[in-house]
């Protein structure tokens, strides 16, 4: 025991231990876990672990042979509860990969949580109701929460369910969303309250541990909860056994323990945030002052510095004002709203007081200033260098640290400006259209795609941010169909746009709704234009005449990028194709964006033969109900190399020194 105590005093022991455990984790993760399903099953039995509802759509997490996530559509209320044993029939499918580069990979995310299949549920039957205390408590919390005006806050704070929280995206933008995910902060508050209440009891630490373990079970053990719970237990053991291990080394022991039991946790964003912020607060604890408000600022500043690389790695953007925002919001949420939510859950007469403070929180959140900095995707070595600079702060001159950080930031911002290539992306937005043209000076987005209840442009925006772009110079809408411009408002609300270009013809309701937003934001817009310059290239809008068919009124764009000819057809049909051939002299197209998703109403053989495209791109949804692309169209394109977003994912054409390189991001 004495030798063990002595060993635990050495810092090098923990460094070696962390390196060994990390190596072991990466080795274990390199061997992909096998699913217990083969993919052909249609009948299942399992326990309902989580239910999320949106209109007629239910997302149900089920513990069967392994955890699977089911989707179920029903206009009637679904009479199932957490913990119920159910039988259900459905079709298994693999989660979708990210087919737009540098965006959220849903398949990888689920794999890291040991979920290998999704199931589209056709029918559900309850076999037996739950007898599990854990699920009975969760069901009670859900049912009682529904009685309150702000039930979403109760569910978020008490069981970690943020799915119904309408304000969550606002909190994310302000950099304070971590306050509404059950995390180490909440466990620290609860443990502090318990230890204070039981301060005269000899068993207060043991009772606190038991309570926190039970609370963690209800919240499904998120990564940050794991970290906080183990840290609390290890610190108590360190104190009781007089091991005299430093707090930093206790944290490293916690990290090693978590990695041993679940090596995939290393890819969990919540885990990385939790550990990095905890490490920063422990290392910089000596700089804390006695003044509460100074401490609040320092805590927020340190948390910001240590979590910055993780924020940029996942989001490519950071709100510099989140340091101040946290100073304002953290006390309001952690000291008032969070404890008051728990008290109101027990004593309902406190609800008016809670509603008042939630109203104050919403008002403040809507008026917080945002200063967003976009940083392109960089090699992980840049983040390693950042942390080296950060640790230098503890040992060296502060002025040198500030200078190094300034130089480092400038390098990141200058990086996109040194890329002199031209890029054309045909983005996979399902059964819709969205194309992107950009270089180091200007950006043009042609169509946004659009899908009911899904903001497909979120991936487009995130991809743009990953390239270091902070604005779209031109948003060109080929025509007013939802699958081409349905997400335009989302783009404008979440990304700076200079000008919007409409097609010829009358505005439909969707376009009128967009124009209201443009007027409100003072964004210039034009329609029925003939020519546009993007950097050194001219884009020609091939106008012919006004058609009764909205598709034929599509903006058809012809441009020459360096020496390569590109043509974007929108949803133009055979009538417009014929008129284009009659009016314009166009041939030997290098890259054709095929009209109307490969529908038989477009891509007439005479038109294709005349323009003779070398490469043809069809933007189409996988297994779409329209049967796109049509076989006749594929036959017409027989002499062209065809790329399809349903098979190839997003397609990139990169022009570098007059050479064309093609990459796909397949499923």
Residue ranges: model-predicted function:
Residues 3-7, 13-178, 458-465, 471, ...:
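Membrane-interface helix/helix-cap signal primarily in integral membrane proteins
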Residues 187, 223-226, 480-485, 507-510, ...:
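Active-site environment of divalent metal-dependent phosphoester hydrolases
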Residues 312-328, 332, 340-384:
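Membrane-interface amphipathic/re-entrant loop segments adjacent to transmembrane helices
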Residues 499, 579-650:
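Cap/insert and terminal regions of metallo-dependent hydrolase folds
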Residues 440-444, 452-503, 582-599, 612-617:
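Active-site metal-binding motif and surrounding structural segment of the metallo-beta-lactamase
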Residues 263-266, 366-474, 519-588, 647-667:
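Core dinuclear metal-dependent hydrolase active-site scaffold
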Residues 4-8, 13-17, 167-323, 378-419, ...:
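Hydrophobic alpha-helical transmembrane segments in multi-pass membrane proteins
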Residues 112-231, 236-237, 474, 539, ...:
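Aromatic-rich juxtamembrane segments at the membrane interface
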């Amino acid at each position: 025991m004495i030798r063990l105590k002595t060993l635990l005093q050495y810092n090098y022991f923990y460094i070696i231990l962390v390196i060994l455990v990390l190596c072991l984790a990466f080795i274990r993760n390199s061997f992909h876990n096998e699913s217990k399903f083969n993919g052909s099953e249609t009948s299942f039995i399992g326990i309902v672990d989580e239910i999320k509802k949106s209109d007629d759509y239910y997302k149900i997490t089920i513990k069967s042979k392994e955890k699977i996530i089911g989707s179920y559509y029903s206009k009637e209320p679904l009479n199932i509860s957490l913990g119920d044993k159910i039988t259900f029939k459905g079709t298994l499918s693999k989660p979708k990969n990210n087919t737009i580069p540098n965006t959220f990979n849903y398949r990888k995310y689920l794999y890291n949580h040991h979920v290998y299949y999704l199931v589209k549920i056709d029918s559900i039957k309850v076999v037996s109701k739950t007898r599990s205390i854990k699920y009975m408590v969760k069901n009670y919390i859900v049912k009682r929460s529904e009685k309150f005006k702000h039930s979403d806050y109760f569910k978020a704070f008490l069981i970690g369910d943020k799915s119904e929280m309408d304000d969550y995206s606002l909190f994310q933008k302000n950099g304070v969303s971590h306050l509404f995910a059950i995390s180490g902060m909440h466990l620290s508050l609860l443990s502090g309250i318990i230890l204070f209440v039981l301060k005269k009891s000899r068993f207060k630490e043991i009772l606190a541990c038991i309570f926190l373990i039970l609370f963690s079970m209800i919240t499904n053990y998120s990564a940050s909860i794991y970290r906080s719970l183990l840290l609390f237990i290890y610190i108590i053991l360190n104190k009781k056994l007089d091991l005299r291990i430093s707090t930093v080394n206790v944290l490293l022991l916690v990290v090693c323990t978590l990695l041993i039991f679940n090596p995939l946790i290393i890819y969990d964003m919540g885990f990385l945030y939790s550990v990095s912020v905890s490490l920063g607060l422990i290392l910089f604890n000596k700089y804390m002052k006695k003044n509460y408000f100074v401490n609040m600022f320092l805590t927020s500043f340190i948390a910001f510095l240590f979590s910055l690389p993780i924020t940029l790695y996942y989001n490519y953007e950071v709100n510099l004002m989140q340091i101040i925002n946290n100073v304002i919001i953290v006390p309001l949420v952690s000291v008032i709203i969070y404890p008051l939510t728990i008290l109101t859950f027990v004593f309902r007469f406190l609800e008016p007081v809670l509603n008042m403070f939630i109203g104050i929180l919403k008002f403040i959140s809507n008026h917080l200033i945002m200063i967003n900095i976009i940083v392109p995707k960089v090699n992980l070595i840049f983040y390693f260098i950042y942390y080296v600079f950060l640790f230098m702060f503890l040992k060296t001159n502060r002025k040198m640290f500030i200078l190094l950080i300034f130089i480092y930031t400038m390098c990141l911002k200058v990086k996109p400006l040194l890329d002199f290539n031209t890029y054309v992306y045909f983005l996979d937005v399902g059964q819709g259209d969205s194309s992107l043209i950009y270089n180091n000076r200007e950006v043009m987005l042609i169509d946004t795609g659009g899908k009911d209840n899904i903001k497909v442009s979120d991936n487009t925006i995130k991809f743009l941010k990953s390239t270091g772009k902070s604005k779209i110079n031109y948003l060109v809408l080929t025509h007013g169909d939802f699958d081409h411009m349905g997400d335009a408002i989302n783009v404008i609300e979440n990304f700076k746009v200079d000008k919007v270009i409409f097609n010829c013809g009358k505005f439909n309701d969707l376009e009128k709704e967009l124009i209201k937003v443009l007027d409100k934001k003072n964004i210039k817009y034009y329609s029925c234009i003939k020519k546009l310059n993007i950097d050194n290239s001219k884009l020609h809008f091939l106008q012919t005449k006004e058609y009764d068919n909205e598709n034929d009124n599509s903006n058809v764009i012809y441009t020459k990028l360096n020496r390569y000819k590109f043509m974007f057809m929108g949803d133009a049909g055979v009538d417009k194709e014929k008129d284009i051939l009659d009016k314009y002299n166009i041939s030997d197209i290098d890259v054709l964006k095929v009209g109307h998703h490969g529908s038989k109403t477009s891509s007439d053989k005479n038109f294709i033969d005349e323009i003779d495209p070398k490469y043809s791109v069809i933007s189409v949804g996988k297994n779409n109900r329209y049967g796109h692309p049509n076989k006749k169209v594929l036959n017409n394109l027989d002499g062209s190399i065809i790329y399809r977003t349903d098979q190839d994912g997003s397609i990139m054409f990169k022009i570098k020194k007059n050479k064309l390189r093609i990459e796909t991001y397949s499923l």
